Amino acid sequence: MQQKSDNVVSHYVFEAPVRIWHWLTVLCMAVLMVTGYFIGKPLPSVSGEATYLFYMGYIRLIHFSAGMVFTVVLLMRIYWAFVGNRYSRELFIVPVWRKSWWQGVWYEIRWYLFLAKRPSADIGHNPIAQAAMFGYFLMSVFMIITGFALYSEHSQYAIFAPFRYVVEFFYWTGGNSMDIHSWHRLGMWLIGAFVIGHVYMALREDIMSDDTVISTMVNGYRSHKFGKISNKERS
């Protein structure tokens, strides 16, 4: 879907399920990172009746619940990649075999380093954002696997039983569940670094380019002003 007004053209990029996934993921990640930090570095122990001092228990419950919601919305996002528009699939298929894609990567690097005068005219994600989001999805899967592996150690539900093989794999390699915890926590910091870069790039594009970025994830439309560099000019 495309709309034109004066010298501005708008494309319907992000469908409602994609936008809902994005904002639910933002909420889940905020909850998971805060509660996960305190699980790794618990609050000081206090004596007394656990009924009134069950703070860490509530923190763990919130963390586990947010993790399950995070998993469900990610599965829904993967499903929508099959039934949604072309932009819903671009984050899962990075065309590294295309010369034009690498030309786009190089041009975006120059743009972010203030060496290019004009931004590119990407309707969906630019090549660097596409690669970064693909890496984020891989990290999300890693966090889900390691998180449920840790949860499976004290869960009696059969649905989590397959994740015990992850724990057994770490024991087989000479490690233990603490190693899983360390990798899971490292993943948290890596995702935190990704979030910082993601927010910076979104704000930067909204301010410095003629594209709408933040509002696109609200209403689904990306607007461009004419006169920007095209993909052909990158070469």
From Swiss-Prot:
InterPro entries, alphabetized: Cyt_b561_bac/Ni-Hgenase (IPR011577), Di-haem_cyt_TM (IPR016174), Hydrogenase_cytochrome (IPR051542), Ni-dep_Hydgase_cyt-B (IPR000516)
GO molecular function (one): heme binding
Signal peptide residues on this chain, from the entry's feature table: none
Biological process, per Gene Ontology: anaerobic electron transport chain; anaerobic respiration; cellular response to starvation; fermentation; hydrogen metabolic process
Lipid bilayer topology: Multi-pass membrane protein
SUPFAM superfamilies: Transmembrane di-heme cytochromes (SSF81342)
Compartments where found: Cell inner membrane
GO cellular component: [Ni-Fe] hydrogenase complex; periplasmic side of plasma membrane; plasma membrane
PROSITE patterns cross-referenced by the UniProt entry: NI_HGENASE_CYTB_1, NI_HGENASE_CYTB_2
Alphabetical UniProt keywords: Cell inner membrane, Cell membrane, Electron transport, Heme, Iron, Membrane, Metal-binding, Transmembrane, Transmembrane helix, Transport
Periplasmic side, ranges: 41-63, 152-185
Transmembrane segments: 20-40, 64-84, 131-151, 186-203
Family: Belongs to the HupC/HyaC/HydC family.
Protein name: Probable Ni/Fe-hydrogenase 1 B-type cytochrome subunit
